Design a protein with these regions (language model features):
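Glycine-rich anion-binding loops and their surrounding alpha/beta cores
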Residues: 2-215
């Protein structure tokens, strides 16, 4: 088992070449929806899709596209800002299908796996604003490289077992995904995720996979 990343420029250059046009258009295009289903890396046996959505109309669209694209399972999470992690407060809504089954809806309660946070998500890093880094009127005036470095630091701390919203997000997202794909209880899935993090196994796996990819 491992993980990998292939840059769009490498696996679909014509699509990547539209980046400048899409930036100038600003608005979300249909390409933003369908490009997550390309899946340049496929498993030998089963391939699962995990993606996020915001608007209620998206789950059936993603589900139908995922089946056409050949995904054995699709897990569609109503995530914070369209990401794959649900809000840490309140029930997490998830749509999913497995095999030839129809799309189903379910909810996960973070409190049932001992996650009780007052915030919806991991707070953004507190960085000083800088002059000259804004690209336009809607972009941030935070240095992107500094932001990325601080975000990575928060993620590594979570993998090191530091309690807080980042670790809770890993547990919550991992547990709901594992419970659906492996068809086990939410609590059992959370227990496995917590054990992997607290034992250091998750961090070792993360670093070993990076080393293999770089090599």
């Amino acid at each position: 088992i491992g993980w990998a990343y292939i840059d769009q420029e490498k696996f679909c250059k014509p699509l990547y070449d539209l980046v400048d046009l899409r930036t100038r258009m600003v608005k979300r295009t249909i390409l933003t929806t369908i490009e997550v289903l390309v899946g340049p890396i496929r498993a030998k046996n089963k391939t699962h899709l995990l993606t996020g959505y915001v608007h209620a109309a998206y789950p059936p669209v993603y589900s139908n596209l995922a089946k056409v694209a050949g995904f054995d399972t699709a897990v569609l999470v109503k995530g914070v800002e369209g990401g794959v992690s649900p809000a840490l407060r309140g029930d997490g809504k998830v749509f999913y299908y497995s095999g030839n089954n129809e799309l189903q809806e379910t909810k996960f309660d973070p409190k049932s796996i001992s996650i009780e946070q007052n915030m919806r998500a991991v707070p953004l890093p507190n960085l000083d604003k800088q002059e000259g880094v804004k690209l336009d009127e809607i972009s941030s005036d935070i240095n992107v490289e500094d932001f990325s470095a601080k975000t990575s630091e928060i993620g590594i701390e979570a993998l090191n077992g530091k309690d807080g919203p980042a670790k809770d997000t890993l547990i919550y997202t991992g547990a709901l995904t594992l419970s659906i794909i492996k068809n086990i209880s939410f609590n059992e899935a959370a227990s496995q995720i917590k054990k992997a993090i607290n034992s250091g196994k998750a961090k070792d796996f993360f670093y070993n996979s990076i080393w293999i990819i770089i090599k």
